[in-house]
C-alpha cells in the first residue's frame, strides 16, 4: 500500500497504517511531518521503516507517535521540520536538530506516594527512554533507567552523507526490506579495526541506556566475528569495553532493566579474546579498566606468568594480580598454543551491583583463556581490603549459572596482603577472583571466650564423669535414678568427645587442609554434637515419661535400649547419610574449614534442623515441669507459695543447661550474625553448659519428686 504526503498537507490521526510505504517530498511550504522514526536500513540518502503507531498533531508542527517498535529496529529518534524550513534547509538527522521536543513535565514521580506503587517518567531533554520508580516508605526510588543518547544516527563518527541537509525536492523513501543493525553498519564502515565508533562512544555519558547499547554492541560483535581478530580489532574492542567499565559508571549498572547485562559483558569480552590470533610477538593491550595480555607457548617453556597492576578506583592506589602456569602443565599442551589473560579491576563491583547479593570482590577479576589441555593454574590476588578480620574465598565465575562458585578454586595460601589460589579453568569457568565475606565475625574476645570456655568445659566434663564413677552405686539404687544418670553420663561423655574433635577440626582447618582428615573430623564433630542433643532429648522424654505415666511402667531393659537407640542410633544415621550424600560431589566440607558445607549442598541443615527441633521439644518439657510444680502451690499458704516459686526457678535453672536450651541463642546469631553481643552470649552459655552438671546432680534428683 503506497501513500504520498506533501509539505503543505497535514497527516491526520490513523492515516498511516502499519507497513505503509510512505514517500515524503520536502518543499518550501508549511510543516511537513514530524515523527518518531525507527531506523533500520541506510540507502541513498537514507531510508526509514515506520512500525505500527498512532499519530496526532501537536503545536508548531509536531506529531506525537505512540508506536510498537519493529523487532528489527535498532534506533528510535525524534525528527522535527518546523515552519522555519521555508527560510533554511531542514536537516533530518536528530543530532543536528536545533529544536527540542518538549519533555513531559518532571515531578510526576515526586512527593508522597503509596508503598509498592510504581510510576514512569520520561528522561531529561537530549536523551531518549524512560525512568521507572517504585514507592518505598512513601518515597519514590528509581529502579530502572533506559535513558540513552547513543543510537544508529550518532554512534558513528560524522559522515557527510548521513548528516548533510536535504536539498529542495529530495525524496525520502520508506524501505520495508530486511533491517540493518548497528553491528552490520559497523562492519561495513570500518571492518579492519572497528574504530569508527570509538570517539562518539568515549564522548557519551555513562547513563544506563548508553551502557545497555554498548553491551549489546559488544555482544553482537563477539558473535558476528569468528575469525580474523587481530590486535587492532582487539584494541578497539577493549577501548569500547573500557568506557563502560569505568569506575564512575558502576552505580548506573543497577538501573539497567536487563540484570544479565554485566554477565553478557564479561562473557562477550572473554569470547572475543578467545578468537584473538597471536602472531610472533606477544600481545599487550592496556586500558585503564581492562588489560589484555597474550602469547604463544610450547612444551619446552620453563613456565609462564602474566602480571597485572591496575587501579581499582580514581585514586593512585593499585592492586596486582598474577596468572601462573607451571612447567608441568605446559608440557601437556600441543606446540604451539596460545594463552590469553584479561584483568578487570572494576567488573567485580559491577557484577555485585547486578547480582544484588551480599558479596564483595576483594581483588582483580582475572580471566584465563587457555588450551583445553591445561587443567590447573595458580592465581595470586593482592587484596583490595587488607583487613585480617575478613575471611577470603577463592572463586570462579560460573558462566551458565551466572554466580561465583567455590568449586572452581582452592585456597593455597593467604595473609593480610594477598591470597594464592589454585583454579581449574574450563568451559564453565574462565574468570576468577577472591571474595571477602562482609559479615563474618572475627573477634579476639570471641576467640578467647571460645577456647577458655572450651577448656573449662572439658575440665568440668571430666570432673562430672569422675563424680559419677565415685557415687554410681549410691545414686542408681532405683530404676528412675539409674535411667536419669545413664542420660547424664552419656550427655557428658558425648559432649567431651565433641569438644575434643572440635579442637582436632580447628587444627585441620585453614587455607591448606588435609581433605580426608578434615572429612573424618567433621563427621565425628557432627555425630557427637548430634548425640549430645539426642541424649538431651532422651533426658527430656524420660522426664515426660515420669510426669505422664505414673502407674504403668516399662521394663528397665526396654527403657535402656530405647535411650541408647535415640542417643546414638539417630545421630549415627543422620551423620552417615549426610556424608554419603554430599562427599562424592565434594559438597560435604566448607572451603578452608572442617565443618558442614552451606553454600553448595546445605549440608549444615543436617545439624541445624535436628538441633533446633530438639530444643523446641525440650522447651515444651520445661514448660510442663513448670505447670506441674505450680499446681502443687494452689491453695497453700504464702510461705508455701514462695517455696514453690523458688523450687520452680531452681528447676528452670537446672533444666535449661541440662536440656540444651541455651542453644536457642544460636537462632539469634543466625538472624543477626553481625551482632557481637549475641555471639558472646551464645559462646559463654554453651562453653559452660555442662559446668552445672558436676555440682547440681543432687538438685536434679529432686525435679522428679517436685513434678509428681
Swiss-Prot record:
Disulfide topology: 394-421, 409-423
Location(s) in or outside the cell: Membrane
Transmembrane segments: 452-472, 488-508, 531-551, 558-578, 607-627, 651-671, 675-695
Membrane topology: Multi-pass membrane protein
Main subcellular location: membrane
Record InterPro entries: Adhesion_GPCR, GAIN_B, GAIN_dom_sf, GPCR_2-like_7TM, GPCR_2_secretin-like, GPS
GO annotations of cellular component type: membrane
Keyword Transmembrane carried by entry: yes
Pfam families assigned to the protein according to its UniProt record, in alphabetical order: 7tm_2, GPS
A GO molecular-function annotation: G protein-coupled receptor activity
Ranges where the GAIN-B domain occurs: 293-442
Primary role: Orphan receptor.
Note: Most adhesion GPCRs undergo autoproteolysis at the GPS domain. ADGRF2 is not autoproteolyzed at the GPS motif because of the lack of a consensus catalytic triad sequence within GPS region of the GAIN-B domain.
Name the UniProt record assigns to this protein: Putative adhesion G protein-coupled receptor F2P
Top-level taxonomy: Eukaryota, Metazoa, Chordata, Craniata, Vertebrata
Amino acid at each position: 500500500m503506497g501513500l504520498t504526503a506533501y509539505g503543505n498537507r497535514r497527516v491526520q490521526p490513523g492515516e498511516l497504517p502499519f507497513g505503509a510505504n510512505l514517500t515524503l517530498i520536502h518543499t518550501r511550504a508549511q510543516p511537513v511531518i514530524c515523527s518518531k522514526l525507527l531506523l533500520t536500513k541506510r540507502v541513498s540518502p537514507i531510508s526509514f521503516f515506520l512500525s505500527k503507531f498512532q499519530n496526532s498533531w501537536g503545536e508548531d508542527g509536531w506529531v506525537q507517535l505512540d508506536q510498537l517498535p519493529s523487532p528489527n529496529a535498532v534506533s528510535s529518534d525524534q525528527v522535527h521540520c518546523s515552519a522555519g524550513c521555508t527560510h533554511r534547509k531542514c536537516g533530518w538527522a536528530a543530532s543536528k536538530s536545533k529544536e527540542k521536543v518538549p519533555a513531559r513535565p518532571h515531578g510526576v514521580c515526586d512527593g508522597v506516594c503509596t508503598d509498592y506503587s510504581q510510576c514512569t517518567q520520561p528522561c531529561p531533554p537530549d536523551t531518549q527512554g524512560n525512568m521507572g520508580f517504585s514507592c518505598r516508605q512513601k518515597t519514590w526510588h528509581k529502579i530502572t533507567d533506559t535513558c540513552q543518547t547513543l543510537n544508529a544516527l550518532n554512534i558513528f563518527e560524522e559522515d557527510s552523507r548521513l548528516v548533510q541537509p536535504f536539498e529542495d525536492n529530495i525524496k525520502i523513501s520508506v524501505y520495508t526490506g530486511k533491517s540493518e543493525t548497528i553491528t552490520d553498519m559497523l562492519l561495513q564502515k570500518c571492518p579492519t579495526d572497528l574504530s569508527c565508533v570509538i570517539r562518539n562512544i568515549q564522548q557519551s555519558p555513562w547513563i544506563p541506556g548508553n551502557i545497555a547499547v554498548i553491551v549489546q554492541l559488544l555482544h553482537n560483535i563477539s558473535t558476528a566475528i569468528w575469525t580474523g581478530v587481530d590486535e587492532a580489532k582487539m584494541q578497539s574492542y577493549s577501548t569500547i569495553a573500557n568506557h563502560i567499565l569505568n569506575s564512575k559508571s558502576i552505580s548506573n549498572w543497577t538501573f539497567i532493566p536487563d540484570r544479565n547485562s554485566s554477565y553478557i559483558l564479561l562473557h562477550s569480552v572473554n569470547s572475543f579474546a578467545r578468537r584473538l590470533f597471536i602472531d610472533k610477538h606477544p600481545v599487550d593491550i592496556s586500558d585503564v579498566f581492562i588489560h589484555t595480555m597474550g602469547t604463544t607457548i610450547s612444551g619446552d617453556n620453563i613456565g609462564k606468568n602474566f602480571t597485572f597492576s591496575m587501579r581499582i578506583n580514581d585514586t593512585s592506589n593499585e592492586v596486582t594480580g598474577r596468572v601462573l602456569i607451571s612447567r608441568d602443565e605446559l608440557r601437556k599442551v600441543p606446540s604451539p598454543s596460545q594463552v590469553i589473560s584479561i584483568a578487570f579491576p572494576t567488573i567485580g563491583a559491577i557484577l555485585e551491583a547486578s547480582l544484588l547479593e551480599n558479596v564483595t570482590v576483594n581483588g582483580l577479576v582475572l580471566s584465563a583463556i587457555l588450551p583445553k589441555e591445561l587443567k590447573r593454574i595458580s592465581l595470586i590476588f593482592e587484596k583490595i581490603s587488607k583487613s585480617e578480620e575478613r575471611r577470603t574465598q577463592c572463586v570462579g565465575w560460573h558462566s551458565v549459572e551466572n554466580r561465583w562458585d567455590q568449586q572452581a578454586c582452592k585456597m593455597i595460601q593467604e595473609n593480610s596482603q594477598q591470597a594464592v589460589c589454585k583454579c581449574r579453568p574450563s568451559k564453565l569457568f574462565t574468570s576468577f577472583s577472591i571474595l571477602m565475606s562482609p559479615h563474618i565475625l572475627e573477634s579476639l574476645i570471641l576467640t578467647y571466650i571460645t577456647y577458655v570456655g572450651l577448656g573449662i568445659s572439658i575440665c568440668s566434663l571430666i570432673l562430672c564423669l569422675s563424680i559419677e564413677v565415685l557415687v554410681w552405686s549410691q545414686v542408681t539404687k532405683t530404676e528412675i535414678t539409674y535411667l536419669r544418670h545413664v542420660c547424664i553420663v552419656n550427655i557428658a561423655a558425648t559432649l567431651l568427645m565433641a569438644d575434643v574433635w572440635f579442637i582436632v577440626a580447628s587444627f585441620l582447618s585453614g587455607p591448606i587442609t588435609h581433605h580426608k582428615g578434615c572429612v573424618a573430623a567433621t563427621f565425628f564433630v557432627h555425630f557427637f554434637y548430634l548425640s549430645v542433643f539426642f541424649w538431651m532429648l532422651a533426658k527430656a522424654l524420660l522426664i515426660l515419661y515420669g510426669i505422664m505415666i505414673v502407674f504403668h511402667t516399662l521394663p528397665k531393659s526396654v527403657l535402656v535400649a530405647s535411650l541408647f537407640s535415640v542417643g546414638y542410633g539417630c545421630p549415627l544415621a543422620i551423620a552417615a547419610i549426610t556424608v554419603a550424600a554430599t562427599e562424592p560431589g565434594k559438597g560435604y566440607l566448607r572451603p578452608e574449614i572442617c565443618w558442614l558445607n552451606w553454600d553448595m549442598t546445605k549440608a549444615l541443615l543436617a545439624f541445624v534442623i535436628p538441633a533446633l527441633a530438639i530444643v523446641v521439644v525440650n522447651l515444651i518439657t520445661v514448660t510442663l515441669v513448670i505447670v506441674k510444680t505450680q499446681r502443687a502451690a494452689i491453695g497453700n499458704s504464702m510461705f508455701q507459695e514462695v517455696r514453690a516459686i523458688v523450687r520452680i526457678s531452681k528447676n528452670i535453672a537446672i533444666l535449661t543447661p541440662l536440656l540444651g536450651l541455651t542453644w536457642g541463642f544460636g537462632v539469634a546469631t543466625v538472624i543477626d550474625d553481625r551482632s557481637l553481643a549475641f555471639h558472646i552470649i551464645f559462646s559463654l552459655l554453651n562453653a559452660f553448659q555442662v559446668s552445672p552438671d558436676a555440682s547440681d546432680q543432687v538438685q536434679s534428683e529432686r525435679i522428679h519428686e517436685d513434678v509428681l
